[in-house]
Curated annotation (Swiss-Prot):
PROSITE patterns from the UniProt entry: ERGTX
Example GO molecular function: toxin activity
Disulphide linkage map: C5-C23, C11-C34, C20-C39, C24-C41
Pfam families named in the record: Toxin_17
Location in the cell: Secreted
Keywords: Disulfide bond, Ion channel impairing toxin, Knottin, Neurotoxin, Potassium channel impairing toxin, Secreted, Toxin, Voltage-gated potassium channel impairing toxin
Tissue-by-tissue expression: Expressed by the venom gland.
Protein name per its UniProtKB record: Potassium channel toxin gamma-KTx 1.4
Keyword Secreted in record: yes
Role according to the record: Blocks Kv11/ERG potassium channels.
Entry's free-text remark on domains: The presence of a 'disulfide through disulfide knot' structurally defines this protein as a knottin.
Chief localisation class: secreted
Cellular component aspect of the GO annotation: extracellular region
Length: 42
Protein backbone atom coordinates (compact mmCIF):
# COMPACT_ATOMS: atom_id res chain seq x y z
CA UNK A 1 0.00 0.00 0.00
CA UNK A 2 0.95 3.63 -0.18
CA UNK A 3 2.72 3.86 3.17
CA UNK A 4 4.83 0.73 2.71
CA UNK A 5 6.88 2.55 0.08
CA UNK A 6 7.99 5.10 2.64
CA UNK A 7 9.78 2.41 4.63
CA UNK A 8 10.95 0.25 1.74
CA UNK A 9 12.28 2.90 -0.61
CA UNK A 10 15.04 5.12 0.65
CA UNK A 11 15.38 8.39 -1.16
CA UNK A 12 18.84 9.49 -2.11
CA UNK A 13 20.12 12.95 -1.31
CA UNK A 14 20.41 14.06 -4.91
CA UNK A 15 17.00 13.32 -6.30
CA UNK A 16 17.42 9.73 -7.46
CA UNK A 17 14.06 8.22 -6.70
CA UNK A 18 13.58 5.45 -9.25
CA UNK A 19 13.21 2.95 -6.42
CA UNK A 20 10.47 5.06 -4.90
CA UNK A 21 8.68 5.42 -8.24
CA UNK A 22 8.86 1.69 -8.93
CA UNK A 23 7.51 0.85 -5.49
CA UNK A 24 4.61 3.25 -5.89
CA UNK A 25 3.80 1.97 -9.37
CA UNK A 26 3.73 -1.60 -8.10
CA UNK A 27 1.36 -0.47 -5.35
CA UNK A 28 -0.99 0.89 -8.01
CA UNK A 29 -0.12 4.57 -7.93
CA UNK A 30 1.00 6.79 -10.80
CA UNK A 31 4.47 7.10 -9.36
CA UNK A 32 6.28 8.72 -6.51
CA UNK A 33 8.61 11.51 -5.52
CA UNK A 34 10.91 12.17 -2.62
CA UNK A 35 10.23 14.71 0.07
CA UNK A 36 12.62 15.12 2.99
CA UNK A 37 14.28 11.80 2.04
CA UNK A 38 10.96 9.95 2.31
CA UNK A 39 9.13 8.30 -0.55
CA UNK A 40 5.70 9.74 -1.25
CA UNK A 41 3.34 8.08 -3.70
CA UNK A 42 1.34 10.19 -6.10
Amino acid sequence: DRDSCVDKSRCAKYGYYQECQDCCKKAGHNGGTCMFFKCKCA
